Amino acid sequence: MASADVHMAGGAETETFAFQAEINQLLSLIINTFYSNKEIFLRELISNASDALDKIRFESLTDKSNVNAQPELFIRLVPDKASKTLSIIDSGVGMTKSDLVNNLGTIARSGTKEFMEALAAGATDVSMIGQFGVGFYSAYLVADRVMVTTKHNDDEQYVWESQAGGSFTVTHDTTGEQLGRGTKITLFLKDDQLEYLEERRLKDLVKKHSEFISYPIYLWTEKTTEKEISDDEEEEDNKKEEEGDVEEVDDEDKDTKDKSKKKKKVKEVSHEWVQINKQKPIWLRKPEEITRDEYASFYKSLTNDWEDHLAVKHFSVEGQLEFKAILFVPRRAPFDLFDTRKKLNNIKLYVRRVFIMDNCEELIPEWLGFVKGVVDSDDLPLNISRETLQQNKILKVIRKNLVKKCIEMFFEIAENKDDYAKFYDAFSKNIKLGIHEDSQNRAKLADLLRYHSTKSGDETTSLKDYVTRMKEGQKDIYYITGESRKAVENSPFLERLKKKGYEVLFMVDAIDEYAVGQLKEYDGKKLVSATKEGLKLDDEDDEEAKKRREERKKRFEELCKVIKDILGDRVEKVVVSDRIVDSPCCLVTGEYGWTANMERIMKAQALRDSSMSAYMSSKKTMEINPDNGIMEELRKRAEADRNDKSVKDLVLLLFETALLTSGFSLDDPNTFAARIHRMLKLGLNIDEDAAADEDADMPALDEGAAEESKMEEVD
């Protein structure tokens, strides 16, 4: 617990605490920035109240005495125009003193910083505050002072209070109204926010944002009635406020006589609790009876999202196993979608309408972590625990059905091109993670993939469409992986494939490497990387082509040996290429090793296994283009004098250039730059002796070579 200043006030001990720095910044942002949608504060506070009620109801399943202090589970709203306060009361689990200090001020939630950064960058809206775990502080959108009175079964009643001036107080409450159990949040509204004391406004807000909360939400309403009474009955009627109307209806004769007496009108003010949310759980109703607006309202109350959902799947499974479920796909991915420290809490699990938990990892796989919704089972035991969940066969069947229905929903989204573009932009990584992890559904998920290609232009293509465009005689699906579309679309690896008119898919998402490693084939056709060795094209069966290839190999055999000797263990072998048309050379990786892109990804892993990296990334093959002028000139020089210093320099320069064009990174960019500078000096006829001492492993190009080979010849 944080350190505090302690003083006595009215016999009760009051402690003052400082807000944690990030929370102080957040409060300052909320208070000093103008937001048009301040109304979301009520949704956030009701949502928190609902969570507290969920907790006590779950605790009561194992020990009924937990609800003895307040058996009824409710949320109450009390507007008080006289004091300009709005109170939100719940009979939930309540908070201990330690909870109050930690949860409301001294320990920042993981999302505090992210929320402020997203707000400042304009990437999110203040109404998303609940998704970042700091919804309580939205109270300061409408209030300049907030008081939280709370009672937990394991502690005394305490009052938390703050005007958001950098600190808050916590007082042991012995004199105030005793709650029994639960929390009462009192908002002292700003003068320009008094609309939130109006019954109509509060009813509208609950219907808009919190209609489908599982607990009754009551509003303390004021009713003014005007009635006529005779003078001599005024006193008697005042005593019988509740019975008066009944007596008048029952006795018509008496009413006729009363007309002769003098009447007078009086106003009667009465108060009563009115339940605002009377809808039964939406998942119990038939899908055809529910409007899109009702689904949207339920989705927003379930998730605290401010946008409508992108898609919904409402279904029930009947037979040996029975459960009902509603699943939603949001319009955008949450900021912490792949945060491994965060527990999945997007699917709420109910058993016979009783909320059990919302972070049941066994209910849905990690790759579907973005799907939100509810599952209500009649077959699971009410007292199910996390330990028994893992072995529960019913849950495994539910999980299998949820995955199946999610995939169906994704295909339904794919029927609308614009909607699917939004979906794919937000959640394509999840689909690819599913391909990597879910072997049973891998083939189905492959149909959801979309890629740019050498023939798709600005559009993307599916694997299915790619297959329909395959050239006659083409046996495989070709792809290239890389850092970006720009980095791969002019890659030397594509030269021969483009010349033959074969389409190549651009896989430029880091996770594509993992997905394609598992997918391996589609529709009976192998997925073949354009950057790995062993690329076979259909004309290799042509006898004449084979003969030409053998002749070229023989002619460049000596140069291949020279290059291998110069490069040593930097490459595994040097061969004549069949895949490049214009470029002088390229570097390919082994069929089962990492691609250049995968090597880049693995180097970026902070906790990578260095020994594995060395093993997987060392197998490079240099392929040289026998039709390229540079290679032909290099062959002549090597044959004339294999110890020619210019040959070594040119080979090293070609190797380092090939590293870059093939998607690898340079281990020593300074040496590469120095080599380029020396080639420039050579081309410009700058005397080498005037330059600084050269690096030992980069011998200067001799004068004979300099005269023989100007830069334009090398080009």
From Swiss-Prot:
Subcellular location: Cytoplasm
GO cellular component annotations of the record: cytosol; perinuclear region of cytoplasm; plasma membrane; protein-containing complex
PROSITE patterns: HSP90
Quaternary context: Homodimer.
Source organism (scientific name): Zea mays (Maize)
Sequence motif TPR repeat-binding, location on chain: 711-715
Protein name (record): Heat shock protein 82
Pfam short name (any one): HATPase_c_3
Entry's Gene Ontology molecular function annotations: ATP binding; ATP hydrolysis activity; ATP-dependent protein folding chaperone; unfolded protein binding
Single GO biological process annotation from the record: protein folding
